[in-house]
Amino acid sequence: MSKNRDRVALPPVNAQKTNMTCHFCIVGCGYHVYKWDENKEGGRAANQNALGLDFTKQLPPFATTLTPAMTNVITAKNGKRSNIMIIPDKECVVNQGLSSTRGGKMAGYMYAADGMTADRLKYPRFYAGDQWLDTSWDHAMAIYAGLTKKILDQGNVRDIMFATFDHGGAGGGFENTWGSGKLMFSAIQTPTVRIHNRPAYNSECHATREMGIGELNNSYEDAQVADVIWSIGNNPYETQTNYFLNHWLPNLNGSTEEKKKQWFAGEPVGPGLMIFVDPRRTTSIAIAEQTAKDRVLHLDINPGTDVALFNGLLTYVVQQGWIAKEFIAQHTVGFEDAVKTNQMSLADCSRITGVSEDKLRQAAEWSYKPKAAGKMPRTMHAYEKGIIWGNDNYNIQSSLLDLVIATQNVGRRGTGCVRMGGHQEGYVRPPHPTGEKIYVDQEIIQGKGRMMTWWGCNNFQTSNNAQALREVSLRRSQIVKDAMSKARGASAAEMVDIIYDATSKGGLFVTSINLYPTKLSEAAHLMLPAAHPGEMNLTSMNGERRMRLSEKFMDAPGDALPDCLIAAKAANTLKAMYEAEGKPEMVKRFSGFDWKTEEDAFNDGFRSAGQPGAEPIDSQGGSTGVLATYTLLRAAGTNGVQLPIKRVENGKMIGTAIHYDDNKFDTKDGKAHFKPAPWNGLPKPVEEQKAKHKFWLNNGRANEVWQSAYHDQYNDFVKSRYPLAYIELNPGDAQSLGVAAGDVVEVFNDYGSTFAMAYPVKDMKPSHTFMLFGYVNGIQGDVTTDWVDRNIIPYYKGTWGSVRRIGSIEQYKKTVSTKRRAFDNV
């Protein structure tokens, strides 16, 4: 949105219409993009506009959603200007016309030179002397590929390091994960790679996968028909908004009872129940309680005690006999061992978690006590960052899934043990070359590596122990900058030698591939401009594995390219360098990147997985990805197809609604494997901070801000709301600190310090806080510890610190609301 407007131009009937999946959260709401000449607009009569709606009279409620933020004016490379409108699709089964505060701003985030996206990277940029200068792709690749080659030729590929996206949505997609992955793993063959939100190359669901159950195993429709929905370490209203509003709440308020009767004839059904596991009373809990307070249970556990909670519940339901005995006997292994290891009485469970025994019993009865005629309840367990980033990710998932398997709450409609997700998904890559989980941040901190590429991510804001990472990266980067600044008149080849020599003295050459010059630009020497959906064709899948094609409808700014084509440029430059030297083995390694479009990359990766003659490919589409084509995906529109694809019938892809309905699991023996998960308390580094500091520093997202605020930092709507990352405090704690709403406070511990804006909230427990995660101004990751579990997954949620008042900024107090965010505002 280039400027504020109080009217919205309607698209004419001949406007171009394309499909778009929301760029942001994992729900992947369906939208339509309308594009037409700037100096034209449609009429108010239904036959005069592309929406087919009659604006000559008052429209019925929710007939459509139109706001100025859903419109923009874009300019093509030939100078032609067009209006665009991006609005939610009522026919999409995901959102049914609902928009979120994130997706509803997509049009404004499309590039316009006079809009909020004016700071987009348009050309490769090279740090020369003391300033950033635009350069050509040829020059940028001569430096980037030249340094890569020099390091490879010296024989230590581990010195070439990456931090990269592994997901779908605006910052990823099947085309781009394949392009980047093929470059890193097949061509360069470096093992020193980390993923965007964790400091190694790993899964966030190792335990569940080892137990035979993938983390996205049901459909959003299952939430409509569940007897009980568990929300564990998850705030779905703010982080999966329209999944919560369009699928969860209708169950809670009884709107889906007729559907349950149709699906489960002869089985007792009724309005749904919800159980939230979260130390904090979130907006999701407030909304659910406003909807049906007597059908909502909040288990406000002590921080980090999830394992104890699930072990206590497992022990109790086994004692009561509320388990699927036949299923356990026929389709699982390891039950007795898990029950023995996880043994915990309700009394001990209550003591550790802080949840009363009565609440624990009620949760167990709601969720696992057989219904009339012995029918097992259909209970869906949804989890996210409270587990993913919790106290020993591996152990928590094991304990939760032990409970789920014992009660057969997977593979039946209305069940599922699923992560709610952050980004959309879109993974297809060659296997990691060694399978190692290298703690890349620590490699950098310890002075290892020569070349670091941050690709579609910003770990300066989002990593654990982020302050230490930034400090060392900046110091090592400066060694290279100092050497480069003295290299006046150097050719690209000479500059590569100078950079390499500087890395031999402790320096680190940094490249950032992104939409914007993020905080990483402070350390970078080279920035490469990427494109996002709309400027390219991109496929992703959402949290129910629903794959869609977001169609290109505009030019990317300047010379920006899709990530897959950036990867191809790097590979082809290296190939040419090795051809010139007559090294056929290296030429072969860097071959296979002859892509002209992102569709070429899609065909080379996603559609080749599991096909005869193809190299090994890890793909979320599996071996039937070959059935997906851009043509079929365009025809499938915003509803797409749920992966894996079973077959194509009459030009339509037939997908998979739910996994494990045949009781065949993803293990060698096809059975679900219980996994012992003892309660071990808090990790030592976390316990040490807890002993020294008063406040638990919980953290997470807010509805209005997407991830690292890479777009939002340029949006006045968001910036004025949150000029600084906020920290919610108990009012009594705030008073004892002499802190008023809107004050600036320092948050600190042994790992770092950061600033935040005080936000007293009556729902916050004493000594608990909640800080906005990953924000551009006030970085919560500065105070997380460097502790990781056996799979190098950090405990982002587990840190303690102190808080002190810094002062007051009067402008904040005049313009920033600190009204309680809960929807039951009293």
UniProtKB/Swiss-Prot annotation:
Protein's name in the database: Arsenite oxidase subunit AioA
Binding site for [3Fe-4S] cluster: C22, C25, C29
Inducing factors: Induced in the presence of arsenite.
Keywords, sorted A to Z: 3Fe-4S, Iron, Iron-sulfur, Metal-binding, Molybdenum, Oxidoreductase
Cofactor requirement: [3Fe-4S] cluster; Mo-bis(molybdopterin guanine dinucleotide)
Matches recorded under Pfam families: Molybdopterin, Molydop_binding, Rieske_3
Class in the EC hierarchy, top level: oxidoreductase
Catalytic activity: 2 oxidized [azurin] + arsenite + H2O = 2 reduced [azurin] + arsenate + 3 H(+)
PANTHER family: NADH-QUINONE OXIDOREDUCTASE SUBUNIT G (PTHR43105:SF10), RESPIRATORY NITRATE REDUCTASE (PTHR43105)
The species this protein was found in: Herminiimonas arsenicoxydans
Alphabetized InterPro entries for the sequence: AioA/IdrA_3Fe-4S, AioA/IdrA_lsu, Asp_de-COase-like_dom_sf, MoPterin_dinucl-bd_dom, Mopterin_OxRdtase, Prok_molybdopt-oxidoreductase
Binding annotation for substrate: H196, E204, R419, H423
Residues under site feature: Involved in charge transfer: S100
One biological process term in Gene Ontology: respiratory electron transport chain
NCBIfam families to which the protein is assigned, alphabetical: arsenite_ox_L
Keyword Transcription regulation: no
